[in-house]
Amino acid sequence: MHNIHRRHFLKAAGAVTAGLVTANIALNANASSVAPKPRVGKSVIGLIAPKMELVRVGFIGVGERGFSHVEQFCHLEGVELKAICDTHQAVIDRAVEHIVNQNRPKPAVYTGNDLSYRELLNRDDIDIVIISTPWEWHAPMAIDTMESGKHAFVEVPLALTVEECWQLVDTAERTQKNCMMMENVNYGREELMVLNMVRQGVFGELLHGEAAYIHELRWQMKEIDHKTGSWRTYWHTKRNGNLYPTHGLGPISQYMNINRGDRFDYLTSMSSPALGRTLYAKREFPADHERNQLKYINGDMSTSLIKTVKGRTIMVQHDTTTPRPYSRHNLIQGTNGVFAGFPNRIAVEHGGFGKSYHEWDMDMQKWYDKYDHPLWQRIGKEAEINGGHGGMDFVMLWRMVYCLRNGEALDQDVYDGAAWSVVNILSEQSLNNRSNSVNFPDFTRGAWKHATPLGIVGA
């Protein structure tokens, strides 16, 4: 989306969001204490769309993230890239050129204003839409996509308010269309191996998980006129909480079968002082630069604790400001042992190749040899060649297309996207109420109690 439009929309969205948050806290800090609205359709847990011989794809947003999806789809069989939409001509031209250079038909192009995507949605030769736009557009575009009779696949996070989460759930249930937040980290090799190990009982009964998005991104503040930093920077002036919870939380949630036998119950959150971006702006920009006029309020480190209905605990952290190595934690603790990421290491009481659980086993190869996930065994080499965050992007898109072409349910649904994304809002609500706990809405309306647990997905 064009930067001028982004800024205007973001300012308006920020004002609305601030009002909604204030109202929510004033009226009721516990977001789920009010009973959910009656379901207007039927649950989409396990939704299976009619088989598609070819998956016809439209793209809304082909900038940095969107273009990477265009690249990956060009590697996939059984897909047609029908149309693209963006408000920035340079990224449109790049995407069209790449598609044509891959010996695929030239896609239709939609541009001109922020609502041009609706022209793309009016087409009757598109099955799914890939949405890779600034965060504030995710929910509105996904809702419009489902209303147009198409399946929505949305970049993270899925939504920015509790009400948006409910609107997405209600629309998916009423239209019986998929709305999948594309949490690519769930398809990383390590994450899928751990899922396999969890399902085989290697760690025993699960007790605790730790998730994070710790990724120093201050350099994005220098992206002024376009690219991610041109709009993402402003969120650090709008909210104080976990702005981006899903990369770490998605895999932990699937290990624990959240929304499929357990669910998030309540959350408490704290944030550190917000110092790093102000200091960075003073160091890297002239005194009169806009970046030095902004008031950064989002704490450099956000830490939330989640309690599940079954009593399990999850720590979720967010830090894109301080100078430190990248981490998503990816820790899962059970009664028989633990896996922790960054760096990968394992300690188990029984079944640990003779190594004591009092010390970490850092040699992953023997664990891969025994527990490497079926998806990576099948397409891992192809994923590594095609890239995309170490191959996880390719595996995710391959799996999406496989499910659609073979009449299988997707691995992530609208309830997952809503539950993982709503941590953004609830962490802010808790923080603004002296870190008192805030209840999670039950977006499944009780269906989590009887939903089939996610298995060791394969192909």
Curated annotation (Swiss-Prot):
Q: Top EC class per UniProt?
A: hydrolase
- Superkingdom as given in the UniProt entry: Bacteria
This entry's comment on the bound cofactor is: Binds 1 NAD(+) per subunit. The NAD(+) cannot dissociate.
Signal peptide limits: 1-31
Q: What is this protein called?
A: Glycosyl hydrolase family 109 protein 1
Identify the species of origin.
Shewanella sp. (strain MR-4)
Q: What does this protein do?
A: Glycosidase.
Give a yes or no for keyword Cytoplasm in this entry.
no
Required co-factor?
Answer: NAD(+)
GO MF, any single term: nucleotide binding
The family line of this record is: Belongs to the Gfo/Idh/MocA family. Glycosyl hydrolase 109 subfamily.
Keywords on this record?
Glycosidase, Hydrolase, NAD, Signal
